[in-house]
C-alpha cells in the first residue's frame, strides 16, 4: 500500500473510538528524541486540517501528541516518555497501581508494543476532545451558512482550538445582526436536524451551490445542514444539530475590512458560562449587590480610583518639589530616590535638575524588594559612564545617549549609592 493511501476511518464513522492498524513507517521525530512519527495503513485520528486542531489519544500504548499531514501523508507523533502514555489521566486507560497491597498511584492499562514498520497496533482517540471539536465545527457551519445566506459574506478565515473558535467574514456585521444570527443558530440546534455527509460526483458537484474556502482537488466531501448550510469539509461532524447543544458568541471585532467572530459550542460553551457565573457570583459578594448593579458598581469604583490616583499624584508632585528644593546647591551632582513616581514625572524632574547641576542628575524610583528604575541626565558629561558602572557592578539593564540614559537595576538602595559614590 502506498503511504498516500491511508484509509481515513473518521470519514466512515465519526463516532468510532478504537481501531486496529498496521504501521507503514516509523521514524524518529527530528525535533524530540522521545517522539516518533508514525504512518498507518488506516487511522481514526483526524489530523490538523482546515483550521481544526488534531485528535489526541493513544497508539500502541503510547500517547499521541500531534497528528499532521506531512508531504501529503497523515503522520502521527507519539511520545514514548516513561509514565506518559495515558490520555492525560483519563480514567478509562488507567488503573490503580498497588505496591504490597497498598494503592500507590495510577498506571496505564494500555499494553505498549514495539514501534516499527509492519507492527500491528491498537489505537484509541480521546473521545471527549473529538466530540467537543465536532460540536464546535458543526456549530460554525450553521453560523457561517446563515451569515452567507443573509449577508452574502464569505468565511475567509477559520480556527478551531481547545479554547475558542474564530471565524473571519468578508464584510462587517453589526452587533445586532450578530445577535440575531446567534439566535437563529440556536433555533437550528433546537430542531435537531440530521446532518448529511455526501460525496457528489463531478457532474452533481457542478450543479451544487456550496461554500468552500479553497479549491479542492479530487473527491469533494460535502457536509449539509438542510435549510442552513452546504459546505465542503474534511472534518468529523455530529449526527444532528441537537448534539451541538448550544452556540454562544464570545466576542467580535472589526478585522481586515470584515469582522472576526469568536464562538463556543456545546460543553465548551457550558464551561465558559459556568466560569462567568462564578465570576459574577464573586463580584456580587464583593460589592454586596445583585447582578444588574455590578457594572454600575465597577464604574463608580473605577472613577473613585482615578480620582484617588489624581490626588495622590498631586501630593507626590508636591513632595517631589519639596525634596528637589532640599537638595544641596553646592555640589555638581544630584541624586533622588522616591518610590511610586511614573516615568514621565521622573524624566521631567531630571530635565529640571540638569539645568541646575553641572554634573549628573539621577532619579531612582522603586524599592529594595522590587528593584529600581532610573533616569540619569547631564548637559556636560556622558551618562553612559554611570550606566556602565551600574551594569558592571549590579547587573543593571538599559542605556541611551550621552545626555540621558534610562534603565532598571535589581539591587538595594545602599548598593546603588555605593556605586554612585565611585563614579560621581
PLM region spans:
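A glycine- and charged-residue-rich anion-binding loop/surface
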Residues: 1-424
Amino acid at each position: 500500500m502506498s503511504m498516500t493511501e491511508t484509509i481515513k476511518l473518521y470519514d466512515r464513522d465519526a463516532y468510532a473510538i478504537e481501531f486496529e492498524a498496521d504501521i507503514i513507517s516509523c521514524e524518529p521525530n527530528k525535533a524530540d528524541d522521545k517522539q516518533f512519527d508514525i504512518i498507518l495503513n488506516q487511522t481514526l485520528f483526524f489530523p490538523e486540517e482546515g483550521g481544526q486542531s488534531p485528535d489526541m489519544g493513544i497508539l500502541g500504548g503510547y500517547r499521541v501528541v500531534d497528528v499532521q499531514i506531512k508531504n501529503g501523508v497523515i503522520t502521527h507523533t507519539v511520545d514514548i516518555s516513561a509514565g506518559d502514555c495515558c490520555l492525560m489521566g483519563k480514567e478509562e486507560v488507567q488503573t490503580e497501581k498497588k505496591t504490597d497491597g497498598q494503592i500507590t498511584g495510577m498506571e496505564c492499562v494500555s499494553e505498549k508494543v514495539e514501534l516499527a514498520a509492519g507492527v500491528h497496533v491498537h489505537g484509541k482517540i480521546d473521545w471527549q476532545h473529538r466530540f467537543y471539536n465536532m460540536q464546535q465545527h458543526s456549530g460554525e457551519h450553521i453560523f457561517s451558512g446563515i451569515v452567507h445566506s443573509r449577508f452574502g459574506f464569505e468565511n475567509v478565515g477559520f480556527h478551531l482550538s481547545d479554547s475558542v473558535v474564530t471565524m473571519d467574514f468578508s464584510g462587517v456585521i453589526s452587533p445586532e445582526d450578530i445577535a440575531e444570527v446567534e439566535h437563529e443558530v440556536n433555533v437550528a440546534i433546537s430542531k435537531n436536524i440530521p446532518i448529511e455527509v455526501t460525496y457528489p460526483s463531478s457532474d452533481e458537484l457542478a450543479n451544487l451551490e456550496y461554500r468552500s474556502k479553497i479549491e479542492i482537488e479530487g473527491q469533494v466531501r460535502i457536509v449539509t445542514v438542510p435549510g442552513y448550510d452546504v459546505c465542503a469539509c474534511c472534518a468529523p461532524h455530529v449526527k444532528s444539530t441537537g448534539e451541538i447543544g448550544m452556540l454562544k458568541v464570545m466576542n467580535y471585532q472589526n478585522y481586515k475590512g470584515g469582522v472576526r467572530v469568536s464562538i463556543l459550542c456545546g460543553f465548551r460553551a457550558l464551561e465558559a458560562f459556568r466560569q462567568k457565573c462564578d465570576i459574577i457570583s464573586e463580584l456580587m459578594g464583593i460589592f454586596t449587590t445583585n447582578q444588574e448593579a455590578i457594572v454600575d458598581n465597577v464604574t463608580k469604583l473605577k472613577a473613585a480610583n482615578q480620582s484617588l490616583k489624581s490626588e495622590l499624584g498631586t501630593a507626590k508632585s508636591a513632595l517631589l518639589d519639596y525634596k528637589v528644593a532640599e537638595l544641596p546647591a553646592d555640589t555638581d551632582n544630584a541624586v533622588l530616590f522616591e518610590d511610586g513616581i511614573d516615568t514621565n514625572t521622573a524624566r521631567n524632574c531630571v530635565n529640571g535638575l540638569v539645568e541646575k547641576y553641572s554634573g549628573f542628575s539621577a532619579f531612582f524610583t522603586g524599592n529594595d524588594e522590587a528593584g529600581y528604575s532610573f533616569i540619569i541626565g547631564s548637559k556636560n558629561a556622558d551618562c553612559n559612564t554611570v550606566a556602565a558602572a551600574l551594569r558592571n557592578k549590579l547587573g543593571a539593564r538599559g542605556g541611551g545617549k550621552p545626555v540621558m540614559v534610562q534603565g532598571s537595576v535589581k539591587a538595594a538602595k545602599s548598593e546603588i549609592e555605593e556605586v554612585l559614590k565611585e563614579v560621581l
